[in-house]
Amino acid sequence: MSNTKIGIFDVTQKSNKQLTWVLAVLLVLEALVCVGDYIGLVGVSRGPLVYGISRITQSGVGKVLLPIVCSYFFIHTWFFFRRSLAAANSMLRYLVLAIIALIVCDMVLGLMPDSFSTLEQIQHPSKFTSFASSFKSVSLGLQTLLKTVLSIGLIVKFTGRIRTFAWVTLVCVLLIGDGRYLYTYLYNAGTGAFNQGLALGMMVFKYLTVVIPVIFLRRTMTYTNVKSADGDTDIN
């Protein structure tokens, strides 16, 4: 890697289009997941739209498959970013590879039969269910740590849109941690309409802290009509 800091990664025109539609689909799916969680939490009054969304998001299959499909699109975007880092000969690509590996593990656990939770499984979890729950908690912590280290590395080694993405990711990681504690405290302290409004605010907060980093990640890779890093077949 030269002394000149890279501010943006160049990808092929085909990859640029793929990244754009993947982002668009991901934004819609994440919105469905968040709205579904809100409906399930506060029991919003039924209507045609609410009923349709709840049918998709609150069924056993929907609760499992929607997050898995979202994870697939996250992996797709991270994969292109990792490949761009590899083309730039940056060791940070291994951090991205570790993040991808953890997401894949979460996906595999989500596809296991015990993931389709019933009331009986929730009240009397199997050994696998307990293991999966513990693993996902550990995975979340490791991903948070990896993203923090990755962000610091990107801030030091790169510039432009790549550095902006790193700062955005770092801020969102910190906000998510603090937001969970604040939400739990306020929810336990409040009642009735306050908690319903708090749940709505948390839904919006969760959606924004998930999708904003992905939007900025997408902006780090674009087609500039010159020889592309994405054209390199190296996938180390």
PLM feature segments, named:
Residues 1-22, 83, 225-236:
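N-terminal juxtamembrane cytosolic/stromal segments of multi-pass membrane proteins
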Residues 15, 151-176:
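Membrane-helix boundary/juxtamembrane motif in polytopic membrane proteins
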Residues 24-27, 89-106, 166-178:
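Transmembrane alpha-helical segments of multi-pass membrane proteins
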Residues 26-44:
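Alpha-helical transmembrane segments of multi-pass membrane proteins
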Residues 31-32, 165-168, 173-236:
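C-terminal transmembrane-bundle signature of multipass membrane proteins
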Residues 43-58, 114-137, 182-205:
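Interfacial non-cytosolic loop connecting adjacent transmembrane helices
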Residues 65-101, 145-158, 217-221:
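Internal transmembrane alpha-helix with an interfacial aromatic "cap," most often the third helix
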Residues 104-162:
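Membrane-proximal helix-loop-helix units in multi-pass membrane proteins
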